[in-house]
């Protein structure tokens, strides 16, 4: 399914929405006022492949630290603001985007001040609705539902539009997948703005990966979503790795290898788990889109190889290397991965 057409905005030099690639972002967990720790985490995220990074700004000292942080990092920076709108005014002087929470940012007058500050620097605002902190009157009317999240988003979108501000992106996050997906589905036909997808408070790696793959993945498959954040408790680099994988496996990016491998069974004569792990580790730097397969026996290996750019078909003590469905070598088991990697590198260079 084609992506929904949305307004393109810019967070720093990263385009979000329109025809821009779906970006991946994360959030530091250091105290933002601790400049050294925050810069170190941002640099880790940069190295891991993040496109955008968000930092918490709960206190004035955090807001004032942003100027030095911005000097020492190159990723676009989003200031995460709750409760105190004055912190947004300080942050807007240096960051690339302001995130406000409609449930706690306060009155129209406060929002007007934030909009004025963002207009002056031509930076966007993310309306970040969170199911755990909805406005009391909206929650009283709609309950803890996806409709409540949608109504909160619509109300604050109109506030910004009435102030002639349309550099907007929207998120609506809950800790349960179904409510999150429902909210995005309902709002998508109603507004033209790019969506930031995520399932909030998703937990540790195992649970967060599953929740995010289901929630974010379902929406991406429907053409919904322009930027994503996979929320994993205390796992910066993993958020980026999982996010990239979700985008790729949802068919929204064609970067890197698509590795097909069998789940193993009693027919396998080789150490397939070790072979696949080695292939993953030694090819993760490759950006060229390739389909490769590493199969443990001939039952499905030949069929998969017909659709793969490069393939290994293991047998007893030996195996085949296949390129574009044709056998190019029969080698002992301990030689297969090295030859496979050579063929992958060769094909990747040819396609660059």
UniProtKB/Swiss-Prot annotation:
Q: Which GO terms describe its molecular function?
A: 4 iron, 4 sulfur cluster binding; 4-hydroxy-3-methylbut-2-en-1-yl diphosphate synthase activity (ferredoxin); 4-hydroxy-3-methylbut-2-enyl-diphosphate synthase activity (flavodoxin); iron ion binding
Signal peptide stretch: none
Q: Which UniProt keywords apply?
A: 4Fe-4S, Iron, Iron-sulfur, Isoprene biosynthesis, Metal-binding, Oxidoreductase
Concerning InterPro entries, the annotation shows:
Dihydropteroate_synth-like_sf, IspG_bac, IspG_bac-typ, NO2/SO3_Rdtase_4Fe4S_sf
User: Which residues of this UniProt protein bind [4Fe-4S] cluster?
Assistant: 262, 265, 297, 304
The protein's annotated pathway? Isoprenoid biosynthesis; isopentenyl diphosphate biosynthesis via DXP pathway; isopentenyl diphosphate from 1-deoxy-D-xylulose 5-phosphate: step 5/6
What does it catalyze?
Answer: (2E)-4-hydroxy-3-methylbut-2-enyl diphosphate + oxidized [flavodoxin] + H2O + 2 H(+) = 2-C-methyl-D-erythritol 2,4-cyclic diphosphate + reduced [flavodoxin]
State which Enzyme Commission number(s) the record gives: 1.17.7.3
What cofactors does this protein use? [4Fe-4S] cluster
Q: Which GO terms describe its biological process?
A: isopentenyl diphosphate biosynthetic process, methylerythritol 4-phosphate pathway; terpenoid biosynthetic process
A matching Pfam family: GcpE
Alphabetical list of PANTHER family matching this protein: 4-HYDROXY-3-METHYLBUT-2-EN-1-YL DIPHOSPHATE SYNTHASE (PTHR30454), 4-HYDROXY-3-METHYLBUT-2-EN-1-YL DIPHOSPHATE SYNTHASE (FERREDOXIN), CHLOROPLASTIC (PTHR30454:SF0)
Q: What does this protein do?
A: Converts 2C-methyl-D-erythritol 2,4-cyclodiphosphate (ME-2,4cPP) into 1-hydroxy-2-methyl-2-(E)-butenyl 4-diphosphate.
Q: Which family does it belong to?
A: Belongs to the IspG family.
What is the designated name of this protein? 4-hydroxy-3-methylbut-2-en-1-yl diphosphate synthase (flavodoxin)
Q: Whose protein is this, by species?
A: Nitratiruptor sp. (strain SB155-2)
| Gene label | ispG
């Amino acid at each position: 399914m084609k992506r929904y057409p949305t307004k393109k905005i810019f967070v720093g030099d990263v385009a979000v929405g329109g025809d821009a690639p779906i970006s991946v972002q994360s959030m530091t967990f250091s105290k933002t006022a601790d400049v050294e720790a925050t810069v170190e985490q941002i640099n880790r995220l940069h190295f891991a492949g993040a496109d955008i990074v968000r930092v918490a700004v709960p206190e004035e000292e955090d807001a004032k630290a942003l100027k030095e942080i911005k000097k020492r990092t190159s990723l676009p920076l989003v200031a995460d603001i709750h409760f105190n709108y004055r912190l947004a005014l300080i942050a807007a002087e240096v960051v690339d985007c302001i995130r406000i929470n409609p449930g706690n940012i306060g009155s129209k007058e406060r929002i007007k001040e934030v909009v004025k500050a963002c207009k002056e620097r031509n930076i966007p605002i993310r309306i970040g609705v969170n199911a755990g902190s909805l406005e009391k009157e909206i929650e009283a009317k709609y309950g803890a539902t996806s409709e409540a999240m949608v109504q909160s988003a619509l109300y604050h979108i109109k506030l910004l539009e009435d102030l002639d501000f349309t550099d907007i992106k929207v998120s609506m996050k809950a800790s349960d997948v179904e409510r999150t997906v429902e909210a995005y589905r309902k709002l998508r036909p109603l507004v033209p703005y790019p969506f930031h997808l995520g399932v909030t408070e998703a937990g540790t790696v195992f649970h967060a990966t599953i929740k995010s793959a289901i929630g974010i993945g379902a929406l991406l498959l429907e053409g919904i979503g322009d930027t994503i954040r996979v929320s994993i408790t205390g796992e910066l680099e993993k958020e980026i790795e999982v996010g990239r994988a979700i985008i790729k496996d949802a068919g929204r990016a064609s970067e890197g290898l698509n590795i097909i491998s069998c789940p193993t069974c009693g027919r396998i004569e080789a150490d397939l788990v070790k072979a696949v792990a080695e292939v993953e580790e030694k090819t993760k730097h490759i950006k060229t889109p390739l389909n490769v397969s590493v199969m443990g026996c001939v039952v499905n290996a030949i069929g998969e190889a017909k659709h793969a750019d490069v393939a290994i078909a293991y047998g007893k003590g030996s195996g085949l290397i296949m390129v574009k469905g044709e056998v190019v070598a029969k080698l002992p088991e301990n030689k297969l991965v090295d030859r496979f990697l050579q063929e992958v590198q060769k094909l990747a260079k040819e396609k660059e």
